[in-house]
Amino acid sequence: MVIIGSMWFIYHQARNPAATAETRAINIAQKYAKLQHPDGFYTYHRNATYYTVSGKDVDNHGIFVLINEKGNHATVYRQSSGISKNDALEKTWSTKKPQKVLNINFGLYQSKPVWEIVYRSVKGRLCYLTLDFKTGNTIQLIENI
């Protein structure tokens, strides 16, 4: 029975790497950033892969804990030090008027914390908008892929 349970667990973990990455990132954020109440998870792939856990710390401050793919480096950003996820989405909707927003992720681009919004243009083409977390300014725009 133990062997069957172990085999099922290994199979389930192998089939669900995103859940494994999320669980690992939450554990790192809780240990190194004193994250108390996780409420979001983002996976960012650009020049490198980053996992971000959002939530509240022990002082009840909103934080983002940005973790590199290896899990050996974590950086904490106060949510109040930049634009919110909703602000990033609002800017995307108002300036780009997309057909549909497909995804939004928090990550690191050119050593800056960023929001990356993936959307479909009105013509249905894939687009990427990268916004500076601290200023909300556009860092990169890739359109009509």
Locations of the language-model features?
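Hydrophobic membrane-insertion alpha-helices, especially the h-region
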Residues: 1-8
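Short, non-transmembrane alpha-helical segments in secretory-pathway proteins
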Residues: 8-41, 76-109
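Conserved histidines in hydrophobic membrane contexts and catalytic metal-binding motifs
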Residues: 29, 46-72, 79, 88-145
